[in-house]
Amino acid sequence: MEFSVKSGSPEKQRSACIVVGVFEPRRLSPIAEQLDKISDGYISALLRRGELEGKPGQTLLLHHVPNVLSERILLIGCGKERELDERQYKQVIQKTINTLNDTGSMEAVCFLTELHVKGRNNYWKVRQAVETAKETLYSFDQLKTNKSEPRRPLRKMVFNVPTRRELTSGERAIQHGLAIAAGIKAAKDLGNMPPNICNAAYLASQARQLADSYSKKVITRVIGEQQMRELGMNAYLAVGHGSQNESLMSVIEYKGNPSEDARPIVLVGKGLTFDSGGISIKPSEGMDEMKYDMCGAAAVYGVMRMVAELQLPINVIGVLAGCENMPGGRAYRPGDVLTTMSGQTVEVLNTDAEGRLVLCDVLTYVERFEPEAVIDVATLTGACVIALGHHITGLMSNHNPLAHELLGASEQAGDRAWRLPLGDEYQEQLESNFADMANIGGRPGGAITAGCFLSRFTRKYNWAHLDIAGTAWRSGKAKGATGRPVALLSQFLLNRAGFNGEE
């Protein structure tokens, strides 16, 4: 699907369809008023007859409106004008895309980007429209024999901006939106892939392909179990002992800033391609969804793709910590004591608290890069789902400015996060009689104690932890990976690169 931006009046548009908004109760948006005027009140007469109230989600497709050059006009209900916020704006765009796709409108000029969304500029509205359109049209059908496609799918969308001065920011918004959407799609595709296909070796192959596609700025190194043993990554290795699939850590390095002094931002993704729970095995109900336990690694991969596509002038390293947690004769056990790469020892009380064991060694490994900041992304705890539900990602950090940056980026991108504390009081829950720490701290504050565990391996740099257990995928009829928090991290890196969307 193609996107472009232009500046023009609605009466001059020769298009298959023009898209304009209508507010409650039966109030035309400024652009719709212009079309109504040139059509001698045709549109307002329809509204007076009760054809459209303007409630969110309502649509009315008009054909051959008098004096209008376009073949059709699509009226979209936007709700009450003063209540149009970011969430409702994206829902309006989603409804628009679905309606155009279902009605065979192969191209359209969209004036919805001229609607007023409080605190948001045209760059934001165009970029969010692109990202929402791509999200709406996403489907995972690679493994289906019969693929359903619309007879006349939407192929081209033109966004209208009020003045020619805003064309440049509109074009940049499309460029950024497409790159972020492609990163989200890549993350969703990886997340949705079944575990008999997507194992640690598959993650490594995707990382290598990324380096091949962007070879001027990206290199990938894959570290196998033999090298992990030499490095002393015993906690990481222990988690994968029960699986016949080798644990592999893929390190993707992007160099956009040639300066010797430019320190990288490191992203670490938990990549448990299937988590049975190990010896502390999970209940069978819903266990199929444990293929999504690698969505942290999938998100990091998607972000690295975005960075390479936009050639951001910063250095970023993405680590995909690939592994599989299975029961078996070689599997690690409750009661085992593991010596981590940092030298600290961990008593295993539950083999289903495995993600932190993988991550702790990776967080030690990345010290060698002397990072500007390290952000790990993990479907880490069910406790975070209880705390924040399925709408907001949990954030913990040992550095207030980094936490504030990430929270700001989450609001900008509409991919929200909420900060949880990392107090010393919670560290006490990790005490062990037999090792430096236990790998679980009991039920109270489970998401926080998991973050506290990781914080013990991050004392040499600024670090943040994103717990995406509640936001990485959906269950039920709409089951599938969400691609979060690709948008949040993309915005964070765009801000670091000087593209904050404030033009």
UniProtKB/Swiss-Prot annotation:
CDD domains in alphabetical order: Peptidase_M17
Write down the InterPro entries for this protein, in alphabetical order.
Leucine_aapep/pepB, Macro_dom-like, Peptidase_M17_C, Peptidase_M17_leu_NH2_pept, Peptidase_M17_N
Q: What keywords does the record list, in alphabetical order? A: Aminopeptidase, Cytoplasm, Hydrolase, Manganese, Metal-binding, Protease
Signal peptide extent? none
Out of the domains of life, which is the source? Bacteria
Question: Is Manganese among the key words of this record?
Answer: yes
Subcellular location per the Swiss-Prot or TrEMBL entry: Cytoplasm
Where does this protein hold Mn(2+) 2? K270, D275, D293, E354
> What detail does the entry give on cofactor binding?
Binds 2 manganese ions per subunit.
Gene Ontology terms describing biological process: proteolysis
GO CC, sorted alphabetically, is: cytoplasm
- Can you tell me which residues bind Mn(2+) 1? D275, D352, E354
Catalytic activity, as annotated: Release of an N-terminal amino acid, Xaa-|-Yaa-, in which Xaa is preferably Leu, but may be other amino acids including Pro although not Arg or Lys, and Yaa may be Pro. Amino acid amides and methyl esters are also readily hydrolyzed, but rates on arylamides are exceedingly low; Release of an N-terminal amino acid, preferentially leucine, but not glutamic or aspartic acids
**One Pfam match:** Peptidase_M17
Identify the catalytic residues.
K282, R356
List GO molecular-function terms, semicolon-separated.
manganese ion binding; metalloaminopeptidase activity
As cofactor, the record names: Mn(2+)
The main location class comes to: cytoplasm
Enumerate the PANTHER family for this protein: CYTOSOL AMINOPEPTIDASE, LEUCINE AMINOPEPTIDASE-RELATED
User: What is this protein's name?
Assistant: Probable cytosol aminopeptidase
Organism per entry: Salmonella arizonae (strain ATCC BAA-731 / CDC346-86 / RSK2980)
